[in-house]
A protein has these predicted regions:
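Long, intrinsically disordered, low-complexity accessory segments associated with secretion
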Residues: 2, 8, 26-505
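Bacterial N-terminal signal peptides
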Residues: 12-25
Length: 505
């Protein structure tokens, strides 16, 4: 097999290298201060210095702040030795999903001496098709295999690439124009200077004095997200529970962040929607930590909440990982059952006398308070509920979503529907008393097939200007449009609620 040069198998070319968005670059130009523009001739000569390149190896600090809206703020601090004068700096190992317009570069050592003249984001990334396109008009070595009796002979041919349209190259070999030539791989003499193996930020810097400087590049990137996941384990007697909270962090940004300080922002941060948003759909691996004490410190920040991990962590590209957020034990919890009516019941004559079967919903509620073992702002997320069985095993019984919940607020978790309790609703009467004035009567029947008594809350959403004409059970006005009834049902028994309301629309 021939050696030397830059080789690429044509059969596997498209799979060997990756394609990122489309060819091009993002550029931003800044005026040089007049006093700097009038630099002496010696500095002008320094301006022709070769490009400097910095990679992840130069990092001295890295901060990653992730928002639960699919973005993250990256602050990458590096220690560099910078020449004097005007010169380009290539800043590699940035996220592939970077938002170029958000990039900011500054010197932390001597900001007054270091200025950014021009900023470019280079994303004309190397792949097989682009490499061929860049070599149009240039000579390439074609390598193909010829089979002998017991071996393969590798034959090299010099060819001028005339065109490459739709991955169908046209060659000039000697005095002939050749297409469709079978080739095992191509050999290129060099990598074109305007192709990049990874997304790269390129700054043209104007530096007043040579020396070591600590610089910071900050930018926003898409395709990093976090959400909270909770495990609520309810005791057998359904009076206490344990709540464990986890942060699930997902990184599909196209970069890994090694030994980073991690912070999370909970809250709805407003963003101007872009015309086109690229969405990575990469299935990541899940790295789940074992149960551990909470590792985040919480603080308020404007109208949001900031959670800071108390240690550094590494966030690999295409990875999901979980980190303990909180742990509350012996949290008082209350189980309740409910049937919930619909507001349209009070606007129509709904098949008088015909029963409607409705689910009896199972909820758990608890207060997010310090004396109950909690008392910190809870980010929005999924609560998965478990309960111990008679053998002591833990069984999954349902899940629900919660919104961002401040401390001292009550959470209500919908788990599922009761199996052994049946609810039937009947409209017994519907009358029009006058223009826009109606009166209607409803009956709710509950049949309890359990060996213990239960109490079911019936919540009825009534619109308009309403009043309860009569009811066989006590009722409570919850708000302007909702009344509530507590319906006790004996074990293996039946209970009925009858009530009549008058509504003016």
């Amino acid at each position: 097999m021939p050696t030397g040069g830059f080789k690429l198998s044509s059969a596997r070319a498209l799979a060997a290298l990756f394609l990122f968005f489309s060819a091009g670059s993002f550029s931003r130009v800044q005026a040089v201060p007049q006093e700097r523009a009038a630099a002496p001739a010696a500095a002008e000569r320094t301006a022709q210095a070769e490009s400097s390149t910095t990679t992840q190896k130069d990092q001295v600090d890295l901060n990653v702040t992730v928002y639960n809206s699919n973005i993250a703020l990256i602050r990458d601090v590096r220690q560099l030795h910078l020449a004097s004068g005007t010169f380009p700096l290539r800043f590699e190992d940035v996220a592939a999903s970077i938002m170029p317009a958000t990039v900011h570069f500054r010197s932390l050592t001597d900001p007054a001496k270091l200025n950014v003249v021009e900023q470019n984001y280079e994303y004309d990334l190397l792949d097989a098709q682009k490499l061929l396109q860049k070599y149009v008009g240039r000579e390439i070595t074609l390598v193909r295999g010829e089979q002998d009796a017991n071996s393969t002979k590798w034959v090299e041919t010099k060819a001028l690439l005339l065109a490459d349209n739709n991955n169908e190259p046209v060659w000039k070999i000697g005095n002939e124009i050749v297409t469709g030539m079978p080739t095992s791989w191509y050999r290129f003499s060099e990598l074109p200077g305007n192709l990049y193996s990874r997304p790269t930020l390129v700054w043209t810097l104007d530096n007043a004095g040579a020396g070591s400087q600590k610089v910071e590049a900050s930018y926003l990137t898409n395709n990093m997200n976090w959400n909270a996941d909770y495990v609520l384990t309810v005791a057998r007697d359904e009076k206490t529970s344990d709540l464990d909270g986890w942060v699930t962090l997902t990184n599909n940004s196209g970069a890994s962040f090694v030994n980073a300080k991690l912070q999370l922002v909970a809250g709805e941060v407003h963003q101007v929607p872009p015309a086109v948003r690229a969405r990575a759909e990469i299935a990541g691996q899940l790295s789940t930590a074992m149960a551990a004490p909470p590792q985040f410190q919480q603080e308020g920040m404007s109208e949001y909440h900031l959670y800071t991990l108390g240690r550094r962590t590494t966030i690999q590209n295409n990875e999901s990982k979980q980190i303990s957020l909180l742990s509350g034990t012996n949290v008082p919890v209350e189980k309740f059952l409910a049937v919930e009516g619909q507001s349209y019941y009070y606007r129509t004559q709904d098949r008088i006398g015909n029963p409607i079967t409705e689910p009896v919903k199972l909820y758990y509620r608890f207060k997010n308070e310090e004396k109950g073992g909690l008392g910190m702002p809870l980010p929005a997320g999924t609560v998965r509920v478990y309960q111990a069985d008679s053998k002591g095993g833990i069984q999954f019984i349902g899940e629900d979503q919660i919104d961002h919940t401040p401390k001292d607020e009550t959470l209500k978790i919908y788990v599922g529907n009761a199996f052994d309790i049946v609810c039937e609703r009947k409209q017994l009467d519907y009358k029009k008393l006058a223009n826009n004035l109606y009166e209607m009567e409803y009956q709710i029947t509950l049949r309890n097939h359990k060996d213990v008594p239960v109490t079911v809350e019936a919540r009825e959403p009534i619109g308009g200007d309403w009043e309860v004409v009569n009811s066989n059970l006590k009722w409570t006005k919850l708000d302007a449009t909702t009344i509530s009834f507590e319906i006790p049902v004996e074990k293996n028994g039946t209970a009925t609620l009858d009530y009549r309301v008058r509504v003016k629309w």
